[in-house]
Design a protein with these regions (language model features):
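Canonical AAA+ ATPase core
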Residues: 1-4, 8-13, 17-50, 55-153, ...
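Short acidic/histidine-centered micro-motifs embedded in hydrophobic/aromatic stretches
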Residues: 28, 78, 168, 216-222
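Amphipathic alpha-helical surface "interface" segments used
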Residues: 48-49, 162, 185-191, 270-278
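Short, charged/polar micro-motifs that form catalytic or ligand-binding hotspots
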Residues: 61, 179-186
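An alpha-helix initiation/capping motif
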Residues: 96, 159-163, 183-190, 217
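Conserved C-terminal "switch" segment of AAA+ ATPases
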Residues: 109-113, 119-182, 204-209, 232-240, ...
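C-terminal helical "lid" of AAA+/P-loop NTPase domains
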Residues: 163-167, 187-205
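C-terminal engagement/docking regions of AAA+ P-loop ATPases
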Residues: 181, 201-354
């Protein structure tokens, strides 16, 4: 038998369990070989499945509870006895292969189960878990999102925006309104990260700004990437919609990060400026250079934005201004009105906050 090098991609195979047959993963008598004159009693008549073909490799079966129970029996026979019968012919497998299985939480496995005999033969069980802290979560999200922030239209992501995006996920994972048995996956963070970057880049292209810098107003696009990824707790959410729950966790995330980044001392001076009737209107398509003009009546706001990030870049400063405004709203110091894609901050009506 010739010796050849297998690339690692060739030494790994996976299969989605629903609809998988015994012949797919173990093997079957090949009618074409029989027609060619090969005897049914010969091993040459066999067409081997994925597991034998992954000798000295790795085979993964996804959604294991959805695998037919008869096929699961064949799986544990290979795991323990290393043999199996194909159409009545005993076949001994001398294979060296690592078998991996994946399964979602029990709430998603209503139509199937893993038979006890197969569970007994599985060497170890690993329960996936959430990142231990926000910093690690940001690293995972940044890595898995795999977004190119450079290129013709670069994007500069402020640290507080990354922190808010990850804190949204953390808040969702701790929310009493969300079914925690189903959980909130990393896909939630990844999709939101990509959405905010795309929104900022879209603004950069439309307005000719380089680099584009994500702002709080870009979070207004999160429903497009978040809705459908949160499973509500029917007992805890009562009459709240998924959109309302999302708005609540976003507000909580902004408040949490704002209190970490911004010193409370001096905030009342900004609030007093709004108490004089000042209104500040922002949007995701407002040019960055325009932020200096719209906050001229509240110079303390402009100064506090510099404390968040001292960059002289107008786009960075615009993002900081929105961050301070959103933080003041989230901590119930000023109010906010949203209409037609624009956000107006003032002290009229009831102060916001959730």
């Amino acid at each position: 038998m010739p010796i050849a090098w297998w690339h690692r991609d060739e030494r790994y195979a996976e299969r989605l369990a629903p609809g998988t047959k015994f012949a797919d993963i173990i093997g079957e008598i090949d009618p074409a070989k029989l027609a060619g004159g090969v005897s049914m009693a010969s091993e040459e008549a066999l067409h081997l499945g994925l597991i034998p073909r992954m000798h000295r490799g790795i085979f993964a079966m996804n959604e294991l509870p959805e695998l037919d129970e008869l096929v699961q029996v064949g799986m544990f026979n290979i795991l323990e006895e290393r043999d199996v019968q194909i159409r009545g012919y005993p076949v001994k497998f001398d294979i060296d292969v690592m078998l991996l299985f994946s399964a979602n939480p029990s709430t998603y496995n209503r139509s199937g189960k893993v038979i006890p005999q197969l569970k007994d033969r599985i060497g170890g069980v690993i329960h996936t878990h959430y990142p231990k802290d926000r910093a690690r979560g940001i690293e995972v999200t940044r890595q898995e999102a795999a977004v190119d922030l450079e290129g013709e239209w670069p994007v500069r992501m402020p640290p507080f925006m990354e922190a808010i995006l990850e804190q949204v996920t953390i808040a969702a994972r701790n929310s009493k309104y969300i079914d925690q048995q189903s959980g909130v996956s990393a896909r939630f963070s990844i999709a939101n990260y990509r959405t905010v970057v795309a929104s900022a880049r879209h603004r950069g292209v439309r307005l000719g700004e380089k680099p584009a810098v994500p702002r709080i107003s870009d979070l207004g696009h999160l429903p497009t990437s978040s809705l459908g990824k949160l499973e509500l707790d029917l007992m805890g959410s009562h009459q709240m919609s998924e959109r309302q729950v999302l708005d609540a966790v976003v507000a909580e995330a902004i408040r949490e990060v704002f209190e970490e980044y911004v010193d409370r001392h001096g905030l009342e001076e900004i609030v007093q400026g709004f108490a004089q009737g000042v209104k500040v209107e922002v949007s995701d398509m407002l040019p960055s250079e325009g932020y200096r003009r719209i906050v001229e009546e509240v110079p303390e706001l402009w100064e506090r934005a510099f404390e968040v990030n001292a960059s002289a870049d107008a786009a960075v400063h615009a993002s900081c201004v929105e961050f301070v405004l959103a933080g003041l709203y989230a901590t119930e110091r000023i109010s906010r009105i949203e209409r037609h894609g624009r956000t107006i901050y003032d002290t009229g009506g009831n102060a916001g906050g959730l």
